[in-house]
Amino acid sequence: MAEVSAQDLISQLSKSPESHKRKEYLHWDDYFMATSLLSAKRSKDPVTQVGACIVDSQNRIVAIGYNGFPRNCSDDVFPWSKAKKGSQEFDPLEDKKMYVVHAEANAILNSNGMSLSGTRLYTTLFPCNECAKLIIQVGISQVLYLSDKYADKPTYRASKRMLDAVGVEYKRHIPQKKTITIDFDTFPEEDPNASLGLNELHL
């Protein structure tokens, strides 16, 4: 049997896919925007689901949030629809906008008082003027968003006006990956007794 030199062995190992880093890993921006999208899945809003994620300069997630009613305000009692102005049954108190906390605001509130100065905000929908006020007040320096579908509405034009005035950068995130799949069956099911060490008990 021919002897394999150390140099040949190193050469063979270096050609193995397992000896190099995986190339299909998520880019940071895709990772954080995906976190926002996943957070949006928690929203009970039947029409609009928005998620947001705040990240510090070390690429650590500080807080996440999604649009929904304030804590302890029942999702089954408060209205999820928009009241139609001009209709005979118009009632402003039956409009969800009176009660919903936006994803960006929830993320900021969920930071539990931590300093957000210099952080980045990832959001699935461009922030409205009310959220822009909060973004500016807490010192978030950059906003990355997926959709700006309401760009022509005064609410969002006002948002951009404020962000521009104070130098908060905002840009649309262009994903490097169009699809990210979460498969809970990726990892084999573990023996529920294993974590308890029951398989090692001898009675």
Swiss-Prot record:
The keyword Metal-binding applies. One of its GO terms (molecular function) is dCMP deaminase activity. Pfam families: dCMP_cyt_deam_1. It comes from the Eukaryota. Zn(2+) binds at H102, C128, C131. Keywords: Hydrolase, Metal-binding, Nucleotide biosynthesis, Zinc. The active site is at E104. GO terms for biological process: cytidine deamination; dTMP biosynthetic process; dUMP biosynthetic process. InterPro entries: APOBEC/CMP_deaminase_Zn-bd (IPR016192), CMP_dCMP_dom (IPR002125), Cytidine_deaminase-like (IPR016193), dCMP_deaminase-rel (IPR015517), Deoxycytidylate_deaminase_dom (IPR035105). Its EC number is 3.5.4.12. Its cofactor is Zn(2+). Residues 27-163 form the CMP/dCMP-type deaminase domain. GO terms for cellular component: cytoplasm. It catalyses: dCMP + H2O + H(+) = dUMP + NH4(+). Coiled coil: none annotated. Supplies the nucleotide substrate for thymidylate synthetase. Belongs to the cytidine and deoxycytidylate deaminase family. This is Probable deoxycytidylate deaminase.
